[in-house]
Amino acid sequence: MELTTRTLPTRKHIALVAHDHCKQMLMNWVERHQPLLEKHVLYATGTTGNLIQRATGMDVNAMLSGPMGGDQQVGALISEGKIDVLIFFWDPLNAVPHDPDVKALLRLATVWNIPVATNVSTADFIIQSPHFNDAVDILIPDYARYLAERLK
């Protein structure tokens, strides 16, 4: 597939997602990094987003809860180029009923080449990166070319 460039803006659109057993870990991470996160636009799946809003007072665009379609909503936003970073603390030790949605979300984040953190260490690396508040070019699939080829 041909690639093109997309610029992640200085004010990032960040999706925050956490499975039930990981919600407190994400809450602690968000509270620790609140001064940095407040400069960006936040999205989250339903329960996680409401917990973050309640604990921090930050504005969060809350989707549906993950099992009710929230993971798919976040994935759609990634596909549309509306999410720049995904922080997704998932539980590798417990299966969830919406495991296919989880896999699809991670697949879309990989396809569209956005930074993804699935644990605290990686999330810290991303948010502490000297490029976190910079505009950054990333390579993404050139969908226009892809579609043109398919329609020949």
From Swiss-Prot:
Keyword annotations from UniProtKB, A to Z: Lyase
Residues at the catalytic site: 71
Top EC class of this enzyme: lyase
Reaction(s) catalysed by this chain's protein: dihydroxyacetone phosphate = methylglyoxal + phosphate
Superkingdom, natural source: Bacteria
Disulfide bonds: none
GO cellular component terms, A-Z: cytosol
Residues annotated as domain MGS-like: 6-152
Entry keyword annotation includes Lyase: yes
Residues binding substrate: 19, 23, 45-48, 65-66, 98
Pfam families: MGS
E.C. no: 4.2.3.3
GO molecular-function terms, A-Z: methylglyoxal synthase activity
SUPFAM superfamilies: Methylglyoxal synthase-like
Family label: Belongs to the methylglyoxal synthase family.
Function summary: Catalyzes the formation of methylglyoxal from dihydroxyacetone phosphate.
Protein name: Methylglyoxal synthase
